[in-house]
Amino acid sequence: MIAITLPDGSRREFPGPVTVAEVAQGIGAGLAKAALAGKVDGQLVDTSYRIDRDAELAIVTDKDADGVDVIRHSTAHLLAYAVKELYPEAQVTIGPVIENGFYYDFAYKRPFTPEDLAAIEKKMTELARKDEKVVREVWNRDEAVALFESMGEKYKAEIIASIPADQEIGLYREGSFVDLCRGPHVPSTGKLKVFKLMKVAGAYWRGDANNEMLQRIYGTAWARKEDQEAYLHMLEEAEKRDHRKLGKTLDLFHLQEEAPGMVFWHPKGWQVWQAVEQYMRGRLTDAGYDEVRTPQVMDRSLWEKSGHWQNYKENMFVTESEKRDYAIKPMNCPGHVQIFNHGLRSYRDLPLRLAEFGACHRNEPSGALHGLMRVRGFVQDDAHIFCTEEQIVAEAKAFNELAFSVYDDFGFKDVKVKLSLRPDQRAGSDEIWDHAEEGLRLALRACGVDWEELPGEGAFYGPKVEYHIKDAIGRSWQCGTLQLDLVLPERLDAEYVSEDNSRKRPVMLHRAILGSFERFLGILLENHAGALPAWLAPEQVVVMNIADSQAEYAESVVQLLQKQGFRAKADLRNEKITYKIREHSLQKVPYLLVVGDKERDASQVAVRARGNVDLGVMPVSAFVERLKNDVASKA
């Protein structure tokens, strides 16, 4: 007898081996029809998978995240099937699941056009409606290589040939199409009902620029039509909010070919930057951090000691002077260790919190650059905490509370926390890792935070906490990190004198809340669609006169506001007031003040809030109080 334990704890017994589909059928016809895959002892498998031992089983349907991934993976194969039907000379390569969809790379004699995509999507719909069975076959490697070579599929044959000879090869067949895949896949193409092809782009074979250029078709697939419609609406909204467009429209920044991945900040954009930096500087000072500054360029020998030269050199900008090799720093941590090492440290000095708004440079591939979101030159709200093992929990707890408070001030209320745990290849003993991981858990628990654990996702030198913020249109962005480092203090010989006069290595916590300033400002712009809250807006107030006779009064109002610390300017141009109001409204200025003879004579201003909200006429002092409250409350 084989005993199958279901997620609710109930058990079902079968006289012999049984498939996932048969178990689902035994539970009910509805579940059998809905089944897309199974999870046997935590492993995702096809519904045709035979269970020949006692096991735990969950039936995967389109209500599960795993089910949606199976749909997307299967739709990638459906895409390849359709392409081969329409363009038999095209060669298939790889087709993985990505966030919200999938892609498939093809080698073809010409680029696919938008008309091609429409035809391919139509063919996919036809093939799905045929409801052909998707069948898994097991082949040995050499036979599988021969099969794909006979079909003229040189890329697929190359992939299979790189697999060890003793490893079984899984092939999936649907109709006349066969493809290499680990699976699992839906039981039949009829399960694939909601999908859309999005775009085509170029991609190098195996990601190597020295190889052939392929055609990458991107698509999205969902369990329900309303989910896809919501996603497509989100994409439309994201297009409207694109920070690159906003940067141009609002005159905040630009990028140009002579400095790829580097940002030219215009006066208004730099005002926003400064507002964010000064805010963060204040928060760090209040939290007991000391701000430092470390060199941009340091000798190769330091990067060799830290391990960056051996493991990260391809991402570093290097230079040579007077027969010495240097690197422009890609990160601040080695420099901070040098400050820690300058002079003898005592346990009484710990925790030592060193912060730096450090400019870093990384040689990112040109094809990966994307506005402010992916750059080569960037500044981080970087800091490193040097502490004892006993101080890990308290320091992690304090950082977690600070991070959540900062995100709240910037308007991000929905924050998800993920804890990345030890990988198979790692430095340090299991005992040290146990202590480090449990310390981070205790800190999160003490803050009342829920978190998701990611086994095997930690860096080789320590576990990590990630902070993911959700924006106004539902996108998630990973910004903050708290990385425990068990290796760098050893590499760079950092030590302190302990209470018993012995020398010990400090624990090093790498931490950032915003991450890259450039990227965070891009996220802020898109979150607010450019309409930044008053405390961050580059221009908080514009004062406009109706006629020349009010120009002097308008100037005096601006001077008063500037003395109060507000970012205010006057628009005294000889233009119609409606024109000026419209122009500054498009620039998303939080407050527009209009002054005519009546307002001048009464020392008042007519106030319009962003969104064409008429707040009426009020004394200048009343408006000042209103703006002060907005800034103080981060409204």
Swiss-Prot record:
One GO term of the biological process aspect: threonyl-tRNA aminoacylation
UniProt protein name: Threonine--tRNA ligase
Subunit-level organization: Homodimer.
UniProt entry keywords in alphabetical sequence: Aminoacyl-tRNA synthetase, ATP-binding, Cytoplasm, Ligase, Metal-binding, Nucleotide-binding, Protein biosynthesis, RNA-binding, tRNA-binding, Zinc
Cofactor(s) the protein needs: Zn(2+)
GO MF entries: ATP binding; metal ion binding; threonine-tRNA ligase activity; tRNA binding
Gene3D superfamilies: 3.10.20.30, 3.30.54.20, Anticodon-binding domain, Bira Bifunctional Protein, Domain 2, Threonyl-trna Synthetase, Chain A, domain 2
Main location as per UniProt: cytoplasm
Cellular location(s): Cytoplasm
Domain TGS positions: 1-61
Cofactor detail note: Binds 1 zinc ion per subunit.
Region: Catalytic, residue numbers: 242-533
Family matches, as CDD domains: TGS_ThrRS (cd01667), ThrRS_anticodon (cd00860), ThrRS_core (cd00771)
Annotated TM spans: none
Pfam family, one: HGTP_anticodon
Keyword Ligase: yes
Protein family per UniProt: Belongs to the class-II aminoacyl-tRNA synthetase family.
Top-level EC class: ligase
Matches recorded under InterPro entries: aa-tRNA-synt_IIb, aa-tRNA-synth_II, aa-tRNA-synth_II/BPL/LPL, Anticodon-bd, Anticodon-bd_dom_sf, Beta-grasp_dom_sf, TGS, TGS-like
GO cellular component, one term: cytosol
Job description of the protein: Catalyzes the attachment of threonine to tRNA(Thr) in a two-step reaction: L-threonine is first activated by ATP to form Thr-AMP and then transferred to the acceptor end of tRNA(Thr). Also edits incorrectly charged L-seryl-tRNA(Thr).
